[in-house]
Amino acid sequence: MIVIGRSIVHPYIMNENEPFAAEKQQFLSIMTGNQEVYSFRTAAELSFDLNVRMHIITSALELFQSGFQFRTFVTSFCNEEYWQRTALGGFQLRPGVSSSIAIRDIFKNGKMYGTECATAMIIIFYKALLELYDEEMFNHLFANLLLYTWDYDRDLKLITKTAGDIVPGDLVYFKNPQVNPASIEWQGENAIYLGNSFYYGHGVGVKTKEQIIYLLNDRRIPSAFISAYLTDFITRIDSRIMSQYASHTPPQTSLGFIPIRDDAIVATIGHTTTIY
């Protein structure tokens, strides 16, 4: 269900010729049909949400095709022209380097980088926002970047919740409870849902849910009897906050709305929204 202000609506893409119009319409159809309430203050916030989801997906595929390597923090490596490898295996932006240039370099020269899956997901989020922000704004928000697991910049606002409905562009987590300690890096897999039953996980590539579970199960202890599984954790960019920094070039997605109800009482506790 999609709510704009206090109105329950069925949005649609007005310009069928805009980039990725069909994919964005699919996002809207999924969100409209889900039980979860997707609440936005304005149409511009919803437009941003659609575009950031699309850029998360395209950035995930770009990273997959870049040659970016899977490594543990012990063996991680980076392009030293833009980043300094920390003692813990993270990547610290070099002084005087623009974060926008350094993030783009990861996608341009992926073979010069290697790290684990959580860091890769945060890199994808940064790249998606870079596509929607002026470089000056991006560099201001994300100066002095550190890429290291979930230690992301304080200006990157994310929402993590449970029991929601998965929409393309969401980050999900596969858990492997009986992982072999000899390959502890396979205790789970962070993955971007690409839509149409496919996910991208750094280290596993583009796979279905069943294929990712199969790969994780293959890395369990010999006597394992509990299968890996897709958890109900969902992580998203907080479009209500992050949309305020977006550039208006390129233009926002043009949306039309079919009104369903305009007197909804909207109650939000944490990241869960309920309609009365």
Swiss-Prot record:
Question: Residue span of the signal peptide, if any?
Answer: none
Q: What's the superkingdom here?
A: Bacteria
Task: Extract the GO molecular function terms from the UniProt entry.
Answer: protein-glutamine gamma-glutamyltransferase activity
| Acyltransferase in keyword set | yes
Q: Name one GO biological process term.
A: sporulation resulting in formation of a cellular spore
Q: What is its EC number?
A: 2.3.2.13
Catalytically driven reaction(s): L-glutaminyl-[protein] + L-lysyl-[protein] = [protein]-L-lysyl-N(6)-5-L-glutamyl-[protein] + NH4(+)
- Describe the family membership recorded for this protein in Swiss-Prot or TrEMBL: Belongs to the bacillus TGase family.
Q: Please identify the protein, giving its name as recorded.
A: Protein-glutamine gamma-glutamyltransferase
